[in-house]
Amino acid sequence: MMKKIDVKILDARVGTDFPLPTYATSGSAGLDLRACLNEATVLQPGATTLLPTGLAIHIADPQLAAVILPRSGLGHKHGVVLGNLVGLIDSDYQGPLMVSVWNRGQDSFTIEPGERIAQMVFVPVVQAEFNLVNDFDASVRGEGGFGHSGRQ
């Protein structure tokens, strides 16, 4: 299913010096977001910073949201992950897309202008209404929680 989302370019380099977000393959779920920087930024171990993407979006459809997720290679190879672990973009948000990055590694990491720093995935939204009850209908699982089914 293809859905049109309004995107506003906040930095003139997006679409020229830095590519617009695109899906890398026909099976890709995420669009890569890039650091829209004027110069390289060094992220020291333990430090966090907010990086601009040069974009603003307005999803507009209350049945959709976007999540900002880390890129697997940055976290696994360099220890650079999202500062808030996952970013949530609500359908009515219209401001700039910023990415919080955290260097949880032992070494400093340099982020170059235009570097891919995160990925954005659009997800369906179901707004729930709570129904207050005194008890639940019994299920096989019941109240079994963390690790209740064993390791093997």
Curated annotation (Swiss-Prot):
Transmembrane segments: none annotated. Pathway: Pyrimidine metabolism; dUMP biosynthesis; dUMP from dCTP (dUTP route): step 2/2. The gene is dut. It catalyses: dUTP + H2O = dUMP + diphosphate + H(+). This is Deoxyuridine 5'-triphosphate nucleotidohydrolase. It holds the Pfam family dUTPase. Substrate binds at R71, S72, G73, N84, L88, I89, D90, M98. It comes from Erwinia tasmaniensis (strain DSM 17950 / CFBP 7177 / CIP 109463 / NCPPB 4357 / Et1/99). Its EC number is 3.6.1.23. Belongs to the dUTPase family. One of its GO terms (biological process) is dUMP biosynthetic process. GO terms for molecular function: dUTP diphosphatase activity; magnesium ion binding. Keywords: Hydrolase, Magnesium, Metal-binding, Nucleotide metabolism. This enzyme is involved in nucleotide metabolism: it produces dUMP, the immediate precursor of thymidine nucleotides and it decreases the intracellular concentration of dUTP so that uracil cannot be incorporated into DNA.
